[in-house]
Regions:
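Ligand-binding pockets and gating/stacking loops
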Residues: 1-204
């Protein structure tokens, strides 16, 4: 009970603490019915996300991105994204998916660069922020929700590596959440279907 009371007092103090200011322009409203602006909208969302962390307006953000739209107005893309994910191995469809995913990942890379440039207490904000990026499908072509591709950046973990696991007897996805909770200082040994922490994920 005492720990909970301390959390309430800390939250109240945080509300009264002066927040950093920004000179960033106010985001302009975009019409999502126009498929040409989806990538720009993603850029806006990442900009707002970064500013929220920089200003200490929040410490936790969840962002869901949906590419289920009419064909994006990107060079080389002629079909809508959802149909392309059911590619059936078609080289043409896979090539178009690559164009879309490269455009989206370029914006994600910009988010990481922005967090790396921003400073908090003398350290890059990225070093003090865990950023988990992933998909709701391991293979959208077959609606297979196993073997999710995930990217974890920042947070003081050792990066620059690719961890792969047995596809038939895989490591539970929830293990990475246990590792992240422990990095946050939450002494949790279990989350959902986890059976430990994420093997191979170490602190820098």
């Amino acid at each position: 009970m005492r720990d909970l009371e301390k959390q309430f007092h800390e939250s109240a103090a945080w509300e009264q603490r002066p927040k950093p200011t920004t000179t960033a322009p106010e985001p302009r409203d975009l019409d999502l019915k126009d498929s040409s602006v989806l990538i720009e909208k993603i850029q806006q969302m990442y900009d707002v996300l970064r500013l929220a962390l920089e200003s200490d307006s929040t410490r936790l953000i969840t962002l869901f991105l949906s590419f289920t739209t009419p064909p994006l107005k990107l060079p080389g893309v002629t079909q809508d994204t959802h149909n392309l994910t059911h590619h059936g191995g078609s080289p043409e469809a896979l090539a178009q998916l690559e164009i879309i995913e490269r455009a989206g990942l370029a914006k994600f890379s910009g988010l990481l660069d922005g967090l790396k440039t921003a400073q908090e207490q003398g350290a890059p904000l990225l070093d003090r922020t865990m950023v988990l990026f992933g998909s709701v499908m391991g293979d959208a072509n077959t609606h297979n929700n196993a073997n999710f591709p995930l990217l974890l950046a920042g947070g003081g973990f050792k990066h620059g590596q690719h961890l792969a696991f047995d596809k038939t007897n895989n490591t539970p996805l929830a293990n990475i959440y246990v590792s992240m909770l422990q990095r946050l200082g939450i002494g949790s040994e279990k989350f959902a279907t986890s059976n430990g922490t994420m093997r191979g994920l170490e602190m820098a």
